[in-house]
A protein has these predicted regions:
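Histidine-anchored nucleotide/phosphate-binding helix
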Residues: 14-34
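Short, well-ordered alpha-helix to beta-strand connector turns
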Residues: 4, 29, 59, 85-87
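Long, hydrophobic N-terminal alpha-helical segment
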Residues: 1-8, 24-26
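A glycine-rich helix N-cap at a beta->alpha junction
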Residues: 47-76
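Short internal beta-strands
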Residues: 32-40, 62-66
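Short, glycine-rich nucleotide/cofactor-binding loops
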Residues: 4-19, 38-43
Length: 92
């Protein structure tokens, strides 16, 4: 039996691609969490809104350092410590 991996997807520059990848990584049965760094997601953009709808349905954890969101807000220092818990970090 395969060991379940913890995967962190770091969202910064290529937001739409990061969100699509996060959705795809869930197909392997691994634990996937999102870390949104220094930005807001443009939910009016269908390339962002569609994968975010799936991410919400899958109940993935979403962390951010931007306080103007409905996601779990943590500092960069807290993010750095939390990332040590993951087997893989995928930056975008």
């Amino acid at each position: 039996m395969r060991e379940v991996k913890k995967i962190a997807v770091l969202v910064r520059d290529r937001q739409d691609e990061a969100l699509r990848v996060a959705c795809g990584l869930t197909l392997a049965g691994d634990t996937v969490d999102l870390f949104i760094l220094d930005c807001l997601l443009d939910m009016s953009d269908p390339a962002i809104a569609m994968p975010m709808e799936m991410i919400t349905e899958l109940e993935l954890m979403i962390y951010t350092n931007h306080p103007a969101t409905s996601f779990t807000t943590i500092t960069l220092e807290e993010m750095a410590k939390k990332l040590l818990e993951y087997d893989i970090a995928v930056p975008y």
